[in-house]
C-alpha cells in the first residue's frame, strides 16, 4: 500500500475580503495520535532534539499548538496570527550533512514549533529560512512510521509558503496563490495536476477518491467556490465544510487498502481574530481557543488542554488549560 494512503492530510487557506483569512487542515493518521493542545509562552529555551550540535533558540512568540503523541508539534497558531501545519509527504528526502556543515540539525518533531516561535509573517519566515540556519532530521514516529513530512505556513495577510525536502535539498514555494496542500506528489507536481483539472472545470466533474491528488483538486475548487464574505462566522463555517469534504470517514475501507487512515481531527484558524478552532471526529462539538485570552508573557507556565480519554469541550476553552510540564520533542539522530 502506498504510504500516502496511510497518512492523508489536507490544508486549505480561505482568502476573504477585509482581511478575512482562515486556514484549515485535517489530520488523517493510521493510529490514535493521543493529540492534546498546548499553550507555550514567550521566552522558552528550546533545542532541536537532534544531538549535541542541535540548533538552539528562545521563543519570541507565544503559541497554541496541537501535539502528536505529546512528542512533536503537528499544527498551531502563534500570537501574531502565523499558522503552521505539518503534513505527510512520502517523497521527502532529507539533507545528508557534510562533515563541515554549518547548518544546525533540527528534529522534524520540532520543525513546526521553530517556525511558530520565531516568525510573525510568512515573508519573514521565508527570508530567514532560505538561509538554512538548520536542516531537518527525520525520525520514526512513536507508532513506528517514518517521519516524512512537509510544512505549510500562512499568515494574517493571506500569504502562504510550502517547505519540502526533495532530493536532499530544501524547496520553498512562496505565494499567496498556494492555498492548498495535501500529500503526494511533491508540490510542483500537485500544482500541475490541479492545472489539468481546472481546465475541465469543477462544475463539470471533480475527482472523488481519497487519494492526495484528488483531495487537492476538490479542496482547490471548493475553497475558491464558496462565497467570499467578511462575516467571520460564515467564513469559518464555509471553511469547515471544505475541509470536511476533503476528510476520510471514520472506519472507511477501500478494496486493496484495508488500513487506509481516517480523519482524526480538524483545525480551523481565524488569523484576524487569533482564534484556533478544533474538531475531533469522535467528539460532538467544535471548540476554540481565543489566543487573546491566553497569557503568553515570559515566565508564565506552559499549559495543556487534555483531549484524550473522551474529554468533551465547547466554546472558548482558553480558561480550561492547566499548567503542565512541556512535552519533549521526539529526538532524531543525525546519520
Regions flagged by a language model, labelled:
Residues 38-56, 93-134, 300-311:
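Compact, glycine/acidic-enriched structural inserts
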Residues 1-7:
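C-terminal segment of classical bacterial N-terminal signal peptides
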Amino acid at each position: 500500500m502506498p504510504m500516502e494512503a496511510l497518512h492523508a492530510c489536507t490544508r486549505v487557506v480561505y482568502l476573504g475580503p477585509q482581511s478575512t483569512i482562515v486556514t484549515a487542515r485535517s489530520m488523517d493518521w493510521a493510529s490514535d495520535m493521543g493529540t492534546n493542545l498546548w499553550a507555550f509562552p514567550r521566552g522558552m529555551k528550546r533545542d532541536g532534539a537532534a544531538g549535541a550540535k542541535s540548533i538552539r533558540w528562545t521563543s519570541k512568540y507565544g503559541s497554541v499548538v496541537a501535539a502528536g503523541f505529546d512528542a512533536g508539534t503537528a499544527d498551531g497558531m502563534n500570537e501574531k496570527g502565523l499558522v503552521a501545519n505539518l503534513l505527510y509527504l512520502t517523497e521527502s528526502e532529507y539533507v545528508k550533512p557534510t562533515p563541515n556543515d554549518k547548518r544546525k540539525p533540527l528534529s522534524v518533531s520540532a520543525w513546526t514549533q521553530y517556525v511558530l516561535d520565531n516568525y510573525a509573517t510568512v515573508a519573514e519566515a521565508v527570508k530567514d529560512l532560505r538561509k538554512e540556519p538548520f536542516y531537518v532530521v527525520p525520525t520514526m514516529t512513536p507508532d513506528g512510521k517514518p517521519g516524512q513530512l512537509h510544512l505549510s505556513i500562512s499568515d494574517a495577510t493571506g500569504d502562504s509558503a510550502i517547505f519540502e525536502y526533495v532530493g536532499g535539498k530544501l524547496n520553498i514555494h512562496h505565494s499567496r496563490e498556494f492555498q492548498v496542500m495535501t500529500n503526494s506528489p511533491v508540490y510542483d507536481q500537485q500544482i500541475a495536476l490541479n492545472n489539468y483539472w481546472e481546465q475541465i472545470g469543477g462544475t463539470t466533474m471533480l475527482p472523488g477518491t481519497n487519494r492526495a491528488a484528488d483531495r487537492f483538486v476538490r479542496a482547490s475548487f471548493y475553497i475558491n467556490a464558496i462565497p467570499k464574505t467578511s462575516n467571520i462566522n460564515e467564513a469559518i463555517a464555509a471553511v469547515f465544510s471544505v475541509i470536511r469534504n476533503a476528510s476520510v470517514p471514520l472506519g472507511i475501507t477501500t478494496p486493496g487498502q484495508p488500513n487506509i487512515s481516517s480523519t482524526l481531527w480538524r483545525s480551523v484558524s481565524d488569523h484576524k481574530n487569533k482564534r484556533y478552532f478544533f474538531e475531533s471526529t469522535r467528539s460532538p462539538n467544535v471548540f476554540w481557543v481565543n489566543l487573546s485570552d491566553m497569557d503568553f508573557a515570559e515566565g508564565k507556565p506552559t499549559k495543556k488542554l487534555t483531549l484524550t480519554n473522551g474529554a468533551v469541550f465547547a466554546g472558548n476553552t482558553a480558561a480550561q488549560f492547566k499548567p503542565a510540564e512541556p512535552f519533549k520533542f521526539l529526538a532524531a539522530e543525525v546519520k
